[in-house]
Regions:
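N-terminal periplasmic "start-of-domain" segments of outer-membrane beta-barrel proteins
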Residues: 5-35, 63
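Extracytoplasmic beta-strand/coil segments of soluble accessory domains associated
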Residues: 24, 41-82
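N-terminal periplasmic accessory domains that precede
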Residues: 40-43, 62-65, 77, 92-97, ...
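Short acidic/polar hinge/loop motifs at secondary-structure boundaries
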Residues: 63, 81-109, 198
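Predominantly transmembrane beta-strands of Gram-negative outer membrane beta-barrel pores used
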Residues: 75, 103-107, 123-129, 138-147, ...
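Transmembrane beta-barrel strands of outer-membrane/channel proteins
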Residues: 141-145, 169-175, 213-217, 267-273, ...
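Flexible loop and strand-edge segments within Gram-negative outer membrane beta-barrel domains
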Residues: 176-197, 205-265, 271-289
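Outer-membrane beta-barrel transmembrane domain signature of Gram-negative proteins
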Residues: 238-259, 265, 273-349
């Protein structure tokens, strides 16, 4: 008599996507959970495929390096929408809490043109928890505390309103406001950060029409610089202070003509407003950045090995800057305004 046999497998934390024509890897939630606390910038600590380094240790600015090049050569995406560009790029890796992420896709080298033209050495795409998925948590929370006085709190709740409608609310709080000066040189070793982050998203999953939308709000205060004098100096301490407010909105609309061939027409819209007031000693740099992105896309699959996509895209950035790069506080602020509008069209087979 043959008894019952259970075959159990566990999905690997990092997988090479062999079905993709690009050099693409996926970091799943199993790999992300190995870090007790993390944001996007810290989630690659357990994974050697991506190198994250400080571009400015005094303020905590980080950058991702792929194929030996870093910074603007790597395109950041959130659910395949270009994000954290311009003024948000130095600290954007800290704007994505780890518990919010479902997976990360890392593409090295030439990437798909569907998401823009800015990927020179690769793309980093973050997929968040989605309320429409069957495995979505109804409610979850986690707390973190460290010996360095870093505290984090994360919570998310999902509500299935009907068979087709669902919504989720995600919240994050981070506090690391104690100054650390391990080598006693008078300067803090890491910036002191306090961050509030809230995101509400909605989803409608119809037979042919699919809709997603979300709104995100972030407030962050970041301080660094001198903690005390190391000699008999009595002058003002050199302080760095960066206050940020950021708001994002996105919507995805898709009409599916043929599910078997994945034939669909999609419209993606997103907008963000980023306000940053920065002080570096007596120098000031304040910037308001407005971004609008739109993409109209058609896709179809002929078979498992052949697919076609074509579309139109538009990206608009506006920067309103006020700055003083001299140490004389009596000097007026310099005003500068810049904008960039980039329309585009593409086809990919």
């Amino acid at each position: 008599e043959l008894n019952e046999v259970n075959v159990v497998s566990r999905r690997m934390g990092t997988m090479k996507l062999r079905s993709s024509v690009m050099n693409e890897e996926m970091i799943s939630s199993a790999e992300l959970s190995r870090a007790a606390c993390c944001n996007l910038g810290e989630s690659f600590v357990t994974n050697p495929s991506v190198d994250v380094s400080y571009s400015d240790a005094a303020t905590g600015a980080k950058q991702i390096k792929l194929l030996g090049l870093s910074g603007t050569y790597v395109q950041m995406l959130t659910e395949n929408i270009p994000n954290y560009r311009g003024a948000a790029s130095p600290y954007g890796l800290g704007y994505v809490p780890g518990p919010w992420m479902q997976s990360i896709q890392v593409s090295k080298g030439i990437s798909s043109v569907k998401n823009g033209y800015e990927a020179i050495t690769g793309q980093i795409n973050v997929e968040f928890k989605k309320p429409q998925l069957p495995e979505a948590d109804w409610v979850s929370a986690n707390l973190f505390a460290s010996s360095t006085n870093r505290y984090e709190a994360n919570a998310d709740a999902t509500l299935k309103l009907s068979k087709r409608w669902s919504t989720s609310l995600l919240a994050h709080y981070e506090n690391e406001t104690k100054a650390h000066d391990g080598n006693d040189d008078g300067f803090v070793d890491i910036p002191q950060v306090e961050q509030y982050n809230v995101w509400n998203r909605w989803a409608y999953m119809g037979d042919h029409y699919v809709f997603q939308a979300g709104f995100k709000a972030l407030s962050e205060s970041r301080t660094s610089g001198q903690a005390h004098h190391t000699d008999m100096q009595t002058g003002d301490l050199y302080k760095v202070g960066i206050d940020t407010e950021r708001y994002e909105f996105f919507t995805k609309n898709a009409y599916i003509f043929n599910k078997e061939k994945n034939t669909n027409l999609a419209l993606i819209l997103s907008a963000s407003w980023h306000n940053q007031d920065a002080m570096y000693g007596r120098k000031l740099y304040n910037v308001d950045q407005t971004n609008v992105y739109a993409s109209l896309m058609f896709e179809t699959e002929f078979n498992k090995q052949n697919s076609f996509s074509a579309g139109l895209s538009f990206n608009y950035d506006a920067y309103d800057q006020h700055y003083r790069l001299e140490n004389q506080t009596e000097l007026p602020l310099i005003k500068a305004f810049a904008k960039e509008a980039v329309p585009g069209a593409y086809a990919q087979y």
